């Protein structure tokens, strides 16, 4: 079973003293989400969001050399788009330009409707695929946010809003951590350890994903200890899952890499990209929405003897400096402009925390099903087939089929490093 849990926090602080009456914001889940009429932006969003994902990936890879990389691009895009809804002037322009949108070509209303459509589509119930994305805003009791902002973020982003006493740091920290733990089904515990004073608003964005492999691995086929090359001088031992199955795959001669698609039983797929030794940076530089479209067109189904490591990794980032380097400067500066959130001056973005957890294993079946269940059409005599062994650094993407969204993106450098 393959499971992913993701958390993204935006922490905002006030530089000026706020004088206003306490605001009792509404609490509780948003249970309805109405899809807007489709517009031109909807058709551009998958490509724009994918290109943002790869730009952010390249920044994180440079900032975290030789480390595992893992994050949820679609969640970050949705959280920043939500933040842009309450921003103005150059603050808003920079946020949207970092995401890849040009306000000259894309009206703000169409953009917001596009994200509303995306979130509603991703949250659509499915018996075989657990996928839920949502937001929560924890607002200081002394701050009175604009009613329009509260209404809009509920309608567009399925956002829960909580009135929080940030003067009681330990209680506020416990409230947020409890919420995060509940929404990630216990996978992220105690996220915030040292909440600072003078924080007035925290935005939490989360995504929970759990899916079955369409063709689960047999536990009995897993090699308990197999070599995985971290670099030229380092080799680690990992459990290696093994299966002979028909997969869509493609050898990209131009980029010197092998691409393999593993389907989940519902509307999602995993894309593994294995560069030839010494060609990782070449592949990373070439990653784009056009590259994904090319691979999607050229993937061919055939028998593959596949070896995939069984592993768990997690990644935590403060994306503040990264987003500023990408061009989102004003939101973190004294000149930050958030007139759509509150009439009070001095509100700016202080932190942008991100945490993601990944587990990939053989199970791929519902609870209670036999772990030895396998493909019914696996041949007794192996036909002529390709062999793909993910035994060195590889790229990993999880995509949702209906919206063509990049749910998760990462690089596995060392599968033993959690």
UniProtKB/Swiss-Prot annotation:
Compartment annotation: Secreted
Signal peptide: 1-20
Chain positions recorded as thyroxine binding sites: 296, 401
Annotated Gene Ontology cellular component terms: extracellular space
SUPFAM superfamilies hit by this protein: Serpins
Gene3D superfamilies the record matches: Alpha-1-antitrypsin, domain 1, Antithrombin, subunit I, domain 2, Serpins superfamily
MF (Gene Ontology): hormone binding; serine-type endopeptidase inhibitor activity; thyroid hormone transmembrane transporter activity
GO process annotations (BP): post-embryonic development; response to corticosterone; response to nutrient levels; response to peptide hormone; response to prostaglandin E; response to steroid hormone; response to vitamin A; response to xenobiotic stimulus
Pfam family, one: Serpin
Main localization (coarse): secreted
Residues linked to a glycan: 24, 39, 102, 168, 227, 256
Top-rank taxon, per record: Eukaryota
Coiled-coil portions: none
Keywords: Glycoprotein, Secreted, Signal
Tissue note: Expressed by the liver and secreted in plasma.
Its job: Major thyroid hormone transport protein in serum.
PANTHER family: SERINE PROTEASE INHIBITOR, SERPIN, THYROXINE-BINDING GLOBULIN
Family: Belongs to the serpin family.
Record protein name field: Thyroxine-binding globulin
Organism from which the protein derives: Rattus norvegicus (Rat)
């Amino acid at each position: 079973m393959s499971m992913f849990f993701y958390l993204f926090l935006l922490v905002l602080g006030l530089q000026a003293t706020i004088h206003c009456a306490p605001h009792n914001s509404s609490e509780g889940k948003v249970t309805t989400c109405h899809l807007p009429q489709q517009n031109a932006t909807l058709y551009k969003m998958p490509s724009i969001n994918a290109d943002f994902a790869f730009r952010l990936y390249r920044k994180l890879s440079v900032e975290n050399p030789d480390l595992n990389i893992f994050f949820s691009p679609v969640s970050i895009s949705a959280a920043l788009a939500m933040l842009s809804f309450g921003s103005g002037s150059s603050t808003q322009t920079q946020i949207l330009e970092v995401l890849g949108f040009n306000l000259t070509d894309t009206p703000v209303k169409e953009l917001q409707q596009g994200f509303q459509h995306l979130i509603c589509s991703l949250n659509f119930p499915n018996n075989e695929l657990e996928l839920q994305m949502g937001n929560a805003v924890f607002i200081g009791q002394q701050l009175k946010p604009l009613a329009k902002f509260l209404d809009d973020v509920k309608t567009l982003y399925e956002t829960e809003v909580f009135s929080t006493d940030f003067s009681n740091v330990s209680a506020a920290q416990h409230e947020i951590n409890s919420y995060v733990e509940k929404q990630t089904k216990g996978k992220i515990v105690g996220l915030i350890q040292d909440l600072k004073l003078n924080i007035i608003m925290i935005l939490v964005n989360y995504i929970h994903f759990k899916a079955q492999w369409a063709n689960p691995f047999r536990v009995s086929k897993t090699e308990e200890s197999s070599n995985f090359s971290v670099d030229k001088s380092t080799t680690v031992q990992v459990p290696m899952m093994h299966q002979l199955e028909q997969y869509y795959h493609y050898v990209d001669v131009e980029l010197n890499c092998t691409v393999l698609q593993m389907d989940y039983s519902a509307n999602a797929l995993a894309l593994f990209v294995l560069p030839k030794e010494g060609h990782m940076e070449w592949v990373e530089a070439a990653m784009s929405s056009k590259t994904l479209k090319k691979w999607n067109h050229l993937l061919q189904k055939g028998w593959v003897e596949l070896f995939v490591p069984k592993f768990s990794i997690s990644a935590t980032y403060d994306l503040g400096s990264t987003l500023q380097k990408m061009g989102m400067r004003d939101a973190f500066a004294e000149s930050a402009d958030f007139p759509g959130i509150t009439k009070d001056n001095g509100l700016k973005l202080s932190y942008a925390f991100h945490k993601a957890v990944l587990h990939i294993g053989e199970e791929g079946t519902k609870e209670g099903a036999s772990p030895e269940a396998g493909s019914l059409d696996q041949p007794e005599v192996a036909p002529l087939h390709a062999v793909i062994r993910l035994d060195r650094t590889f790229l990993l993407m999880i995509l949702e089929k209906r919206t063509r969204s990049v749910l998760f993106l990462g690089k596995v450098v060392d599968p033993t490093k959690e």
